[in-house]
Amino acid sequence: MEGAGGKPTAVVAVVTEPRFTQRYREYLEKHKLLDRQHRVKKLRDGTVALPVLREALLEQHLRELRNRVAPGSTCVPTQLLDPVPSKKAQSYSPAQRLCLEVSRWVEGRGVTWSAKLEADLPRSWQRHGDLLLLSEDCFQAKQWRHLEPELWETVASALGAQRLAKRGRVSPDSTRTPAVSLLLGDHGWVEHVDNGIRYKFDVTQCMFSFGNITEKLRVASLPCVGEVLVDLYAGIGYFTLPFLVHAEAAFVHACEWNPHAVVALRNNLELNGVADRCQIHFGDNRKLKLSNVADRVNLGLIPSSEEGWPIACRVLKQDAGGILHIHQNVESFPGKTLQPPGSSEMEEHWPSPHQIISNQLNNGATSDSRRKTLSVATKPEWQRWAKAAETRIATLLHQVHGKRWKTQILHIQPVKSYAPHVDHIVLDLECRPCHLVG
């Protein structure tokens, strides 16, 4: 996401201890991974965040930093909100150029330029290759309508794009279809590369979350060799693909009911050479016929995936159990009473990338995330929600399988922040039949 002046509202960074900063910087510069548009930032816990180029960063780079470049270092991908531009970047402002070129063009059409029109120019946008996706809160004044469609050619030229689209509100339907209109160009298909994985999709039909990059990197490092995974909310393959390509899951059952996302998912599986290890289940996952197949289940739906919990319990292997990766938006307002899972007010929301969180076993978190070299940022609200979810899942497992199961919280991972006091987290929950754990 780019903001006014071309400054992203968040960038990906690699966090380590100060004594390893120079070694990290030299490695990142050598491999053309260092983001020179933003400053290195010292975090509150004393660690240092080095901004990196999101599309170029691979999981193998993180392994090299940990194991070869700086053995013993803590290497954690995270996001920096409102990063500080470097001195070089501060002299370059796409927003200023946009204002200058649009105002000149508007006045050349005989329309008076005003402070109202200037305030109505876009303050943020997403760049998808040659397509620029504008935010919904721009170009709302009536005067713009009389200047279309030539206006969009001027905007695209000023911002270095060939196609333009404008975001609306996400449809409240269950498929979360984005209300995006194409302003300039013949189609909305774009391609992104994250951690070496190619994602193609139509921005007018499918959503793409830039903020999930740290979770995609974490998923890519999970030990899934030989495992079967069920992804209950696959979308265009946000997590299905990292599980297949990097975590080396043996097979993935991908569930999705948005037909446009299914088209993109099928294409992305082919693009990345893993179509033979994935079966797409198109439709409502509550009608899924699978059971007793999964070593892991990914529940990547926010604000809550609770409707999918009974299905997740059913598809876990009856005799061996497995791991659930449960996404949730959790409110952390001071003094607010947390609603337990199963209540009518379960819909929660949330924000920012801290680092690590709790884990009590090895499974479900990388070795670096188990170290205490970075400050533990677990909020009490996250812990309370996780404990309530653990209890609820244990009850569901008993109901589904007719026998007692033991559940244990392995890890709580922050993904991103939406607003103050609203946190998107992932709970890694181990679920085993009691006869396996004594």
From Swiss-Prot:
Q: What positions does the entry give for S-adenosyl-L-methionine binding?
A: S209, K216, E256, D284, N285
Which pathway does it serve? Answer: tRNA modification; wybutosine-tRNA(Phe) biosynthesis
One Gene Ontology BP term is: tRNA methylation
One molecular function GO term is: tRNA 4-demethylwyosine alpha-amino-alpha-carboxypropyltransferase activity
Q: Which PROSITE patterns match?
A: SAM_MT_TRM5_TYW2 (PS51684)
According to its UniProt record, which reaction does this protein catalyse? 4-demethylwyosine(37) in tRNA(Phe) + S-adenosyl-L-methionine = 4-demethyl-7-[(3S)-3-amino-3-carboxypropyl]wyosine(37) in tRNA(Phe) + S-methyl-5'-thioadenosine + H(+)
Q: Which organism is it from?
A: Bos taurus (Bovine)
What is the protein name for this chain? tRNA wybutosine-synthesizing protein 2 homolog
What Gene3D superfamilies does the annotation carry?
Met-10+ protein-like domains, Vaccinia Virus protein VP39
**One cellular component term from this protein's GO annotations in UniProt:** cytoplasm
Disulfide bridge map: none
Record keywords: Transcription included? Answer: no
**Family statement:** Belongs to the class I-like SAM-binding methyltransferase superfamily. TRM5/TYW2 family.
Q: Entry's Pfam families?
A: TRM5-TYW2_MTfase, TYW2_N, TYW2_N_2
